């Protein structure tokens, strides 16, 4: 008998078993990959968006070779295609403005376009001629374009020309990829720093500062009816002068401020409320989106909504009642015991974009800005 004969069947059996185990391992890996891929594919991205592929380009244009070696918060290069309304702003360190953010290199120097990780395009500055003012047709691989607007759809032209251009949205709308509201409330870190309201300094009743006067607009029509029953001091073009630097001092003398928006759209709650009214410690009387929309950002007793009244005459009567009833008037300031208002700045908005880009690496395309925004 060949001394190797008895070992041959055992060797074959072990070889077959190893082959079966290898095939089983390959099958498990394949189905695990398939399941993950399906999970991503069957997610529910925001309407109008399409997830294309993850970003595979490292900061400033180089290809990623080893993802494990990439820092958690790489220094990103962000290009501002234009300054907002062509007005330069100071750019402080993002690490000092947004908790958890690392610093980004933010610049308006268009020469860095080929190396930029992202480009922020302010819609107002390109909307009158998008074909001439948009970015070059050749885009560096992985570069993300961010559509930015703080204006309402009523004041944004040629949105349809932007189909397929942008990867992220940035606006006052809470469903934007980068949410940049005009203002917000935040808790006091300790005792409120503001002194109690000095009611004796409120010597006037109702004010309104308006620069864009359109007689056929909803807010002007409402004012025309309201003033028949209540004295309203109007500041701005063709009205009482309001010298630069005196707005807060002037408006703080009033008990109420008409925070009337120039157009009525979801989440469009602007500096008319956050700055003109709340920073002046005046109770805002709002005309804009629904009360429910306001209550997403403010306590229900922090403002008065025109929709709460059947007519401007009824609103006028209510304001006159509050003027005489100090306790009821002061109830509109109770929320300030625990919360304080904050207002946006361009620099803060840019740093929010910086933080978002650090946190979110997926690459998507906004199919239609117009379909989402209007």
Curated annotation (Swiss-Prot):
Pathway: Protein modification; protein glycosylation. It is an enzyme of class 2 (transferase). GO terms for biological process: ceramide metabolic process; fucosylation; oligosaccharide metabolic process; protein N-linked glycosylation; protein O-linked glycosylation. One of its GO terms (molecular function) is 4-galactosyl-N-acetylglucosaminide 3-alpha-L-fucosyltransferase activity. Residues 35-374 are lumenal. Its EC number is 2.4.1.152, 2.4.1.65. SUPFAM superfamilies: UDP-Glycosyltransferase/glycogen phosphorylase. It is found in: Golgi apparatus, Golgi stack membrane. Residues 1-15 are cytoplasmic. It is a single-pass type II membrane protein. The chain crosses the membrane at residues 16-34. Pfam families: Glyco_tran_10_N, Glyco_transf_10. One of its GO terms (cellular component) is Golgi cisterna membrane. It catalyses: a beta-D-galactosyl-(1->3)-N-acetyl-beta-D-glucosaminyl derivative + GDP-beta-L-fucose = a beta-D-galactosyl-(1->3)-[alpha-L-fucosyl-(1->4)]-N-acetyl-beta-D-glucosaminyl derivative + GDP + H(+); an N-acetyl-alpha-neuraminyl-(2->3)-beta-D-galactosyl-(1->4)-N-acetyl-beta-D-glucosaminyl derivative + GDP-beta-L-fucose = an alpha-Neu5Ac-(2->3)-beta-D-Gal-(1->4)-[alpha-L-Fuc-(1->3)]-beta-D-GlcNAc derivative + GDP + H(+); an alpha-Neu5Ac-(2->3)-beta-D-Gal-(1->4)-beta-D-GlcNAc-(1->3)-beta-D-Gal-(1->4)-[alpha-L-Fuc-(1->3)]-beta-D-GlcNAc derivative + GDP-beta-L-fucose = an alpha-Neu5Ac-(2->3)-beta-D-Gal-(1->4)-[alpha-L-Fuc-(1->3)]-beta-D-GlcNAc-(1->3)-beta-D-Gal-(1->4)-[alpha-L-Fuc-(1->3)]-beta-D-GlcNAc derivative + GDP + H(+); a beta-D-galactosyl-(1->4)-N-acetyl-beta-D-glucosaminyl derivative + GDP-beta-L-fucose = a beta-D-galactosyl-(1->4)-[alpha-L-fucosyl-(1->3)]-N-acetyl-beta-D-glucosaminyl derivative + GDP + H(+). Keywords: Glycoprotein, Glycosyltransferase, Golgi apparatus, Lipid metabolism, Membrane, Signal-anchor, Transferase, Transmembrane, Transmembrane helix. Its main location: Golgi. Glycans are attached at residues 60, 105, 167, 198. Belongs to the glycosyltransferase 10 family. Catalyzes preferentially the transfer of L-fucose, from a guanosine diphosphate-beta-L-fucose, to the N-acetyl-beta-D-glucosamine (GlcNAc) of an N-acetyllactosamine unit (type 2 chain) of an oligosaccharide, or a glycoprotein- and a glycolipid-linked N-acetyllactosamine unit via an alpha (1,3) linkage and participates in the surface expression of VIM-2, Lewis X/SSEA-1 and sialyl Lewis X antigens. Preferentially transfers fucose to the GlcNAc of an internal N-acetyllactosamine unit of a poly-N-acetyllactosamine chain acceptor substrate. This is 4-galactosyl-N-acetylglucosaminide 3-alpha-L-fucosyltransferase FUT5. The gene is FUT5.
């Amino acid at each position: 008998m060949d001394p190797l004969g008895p070992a041959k069947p055992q060797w074959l059996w072990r070889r077959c078993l190893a082959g079966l185990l290898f095939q089983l391992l390959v099958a498990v890996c394949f189905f695990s990959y398939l399941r993950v891929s399906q999970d991503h594919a069957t997610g529910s991205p925001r309407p109008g968006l399409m997830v294309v592929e993850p970003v595979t380009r490292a900061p400033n244009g180089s290809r990623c070779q080893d993802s494990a070696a990439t820092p958690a918060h790489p220094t990103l290069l962000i290009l501002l295609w234009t300054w907002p309304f062509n007005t330069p702003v100071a750019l402080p360190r993002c690490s000092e403005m947004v908790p958890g953010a690392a610093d980004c290199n933010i610049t308006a120097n268009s020469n860095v376009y080929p190396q930029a990780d992202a480009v922020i395009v302010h819609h107002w500055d390109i909307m009158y001629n998008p074909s001439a003012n948009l970015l070059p047709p050749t885009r560096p691989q992985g570069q993300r374009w961010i559509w930015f607007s703080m204006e309402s759809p009523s004041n944004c032209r040629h949105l349809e020309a932007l189909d397929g251009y942008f990867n992220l949205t940035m606006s006052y709308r809470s469903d934007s990829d980068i949410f940049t509201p005009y203002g917000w409330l935040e808790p006091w870190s300790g005792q409120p720093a503001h002194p109690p309201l000095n009611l004796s300094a409120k010597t006037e009743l109702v004010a309104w500062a308006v620069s864009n006067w359109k007689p056929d607009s909803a807010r002007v029509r409402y004012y025309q009816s309201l003033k028949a029953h209540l004295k309203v001091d109007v500041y701005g073009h063709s009205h009482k002068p309001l010298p630069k630097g005196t707005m807060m001092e002037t408006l703080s003398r009033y008990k109420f401020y008409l925070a009337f928006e120039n157009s009525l759209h979801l989440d469009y709650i602007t500096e008319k409320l956050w700055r003109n009214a709340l920073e002046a410690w005046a109770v805002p009387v709002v005309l804009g989106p629904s009360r429910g929309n306001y209550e997403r950002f403010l306590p229900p007793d922090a403002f008065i909504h025109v929709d709460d009244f059947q007519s401007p005459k009824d609103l006028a009567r209510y304001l006159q009642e509050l003027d005489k009833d100090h306790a009821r008037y002061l109830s509109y300031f109770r929320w300030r015991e625990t919360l304080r208002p904050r207002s946006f700045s361009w620099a803060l908005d840019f740093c929010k974009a910086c933080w978002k880009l650090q946190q979110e690496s997926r690459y998507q395309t906004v199919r239609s800005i117009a379909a989402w925004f209007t």
